UniProtKB/Swiss-Prot annotation:
Biased composition range(s): Polar residues: 1-19
Subcellular location: Cytoplasm, Cytosol
Major subcellular site: cytoplasm
GO biological-process terms attached to the record: cellular response to oxidative stress; response to oxidative stress
GO MF, one annotated term: peptide-methionine (S)-S-oxide reductase activity
Species this protein is from: Arabidopsis thaliana
Pfam families: PMSR
Protein name as catalogued: Peptide methionine sulfoxide reductase A2
Family named by the database record: Belongs to the MsrA Met sulfoxide reductase family.
Positions of the UniProt region annotated as Disordered: 1-30
Gene: MRSA2
Keyword flag GTP-binding: no
Enzyme class (EC, first level): oxidoreductase
Control of this protein's activity: Activated during dark in short day conditions.
């Protein structure tokens, strides 16, 4: 038989496997902000014996806290978040501008040494109450102007002081005056931030009646 008539063996051609398309890495979504009725509860914390609470929102809480620390009769200051929709928010949560919390300073003061009116006077002097959700270049609901009262007397004095302050200004005051709701203490590094040196490591004095200018970032 002619060898040319032999059945040809099939040739096997080796091929490289087709590259598998690589999916982009999955980025975990941030947890959604979940509204909680707990955030709407009243502030039921109790001040030290002989003291009363007062609470104010006047922009970034660092400089506002130091100003209140310097008032004779103020015994304790804390910075935190309130009047938002979520329970136990972090600073990062608040900065998303989705929780509606305000940055606040909660003050304990001895009414025998310091009047609520004194605290109100400082509040008005520390910020611009006519800019909605804004203080200077700081934008967002966390920087809004607010007075959060603990007693009917505080509410009365707050509203009277607003009327008095409005007469001095051409623009309309947008300060909210509302009952104090649940207070969420801010992270420890925010507490007495400027006294500890602030952003630049330059400690500022909390001494009573100190008149040194307050540098908002340290």
């Amino acid at each position: 038989m002619d060898s040319s008539l032999k059945t040809q063996e099939p040739q096997v051609v080796e091929t490289s496997p087709s590259p598998v398309a690589q999916e982009p890495p999955q980025v975990a979504d941030k947890p959604a902000i979940v509204p909680s009725p707990i955030a709407q509860e009243p502030d039921n914390d109790v001040p030290a014996p002989g003291n009363e609470f007062a609470e104010f929102a006047a922009g970034c809480f660092w400089g506002v806290e130091l100003a209140f620390q310097r008032i004779p009769g103020v015994t304790v200051t804390e910075v935190g978040y309130t009047h938002g929709i979520s329970h136990n928010p972090s600073y990062e949560d608040v900065c998303t501008n989705t929780t509606n919390h305000a940055e606040v300073v909660r003050v304990q003061y001895d009414p025998k040494e310091c009047t609520y009116e004194t605290l109100l006077d400082l509040f008005w002097s520390r910020h611009n109450p006519t800019t909605l959700n804004r203080q200077g270049e700081l934008l967002g609901a966390q920087y809004r102007s607010g007075i959060y009262f603990y007693t009917p007397e505080q509410e009365k004095l707050a509203r009277e002081s607003l009327e008095k302050e409005q007469k001095k200004l051409e623009d309309k005051i947008v300060t909210e005056i509302l009952p104090a709701k649940k207070f969420y203490k801010a992270e420890e590094y925010h507490q007495q931030y400027l006294v500890k040196g602030g952003m630049h490591g330059n400690a500022q004095s909390p001494a009573k009646s100190c008149k040194d200018p307050i540098r908002c970032y340290g």
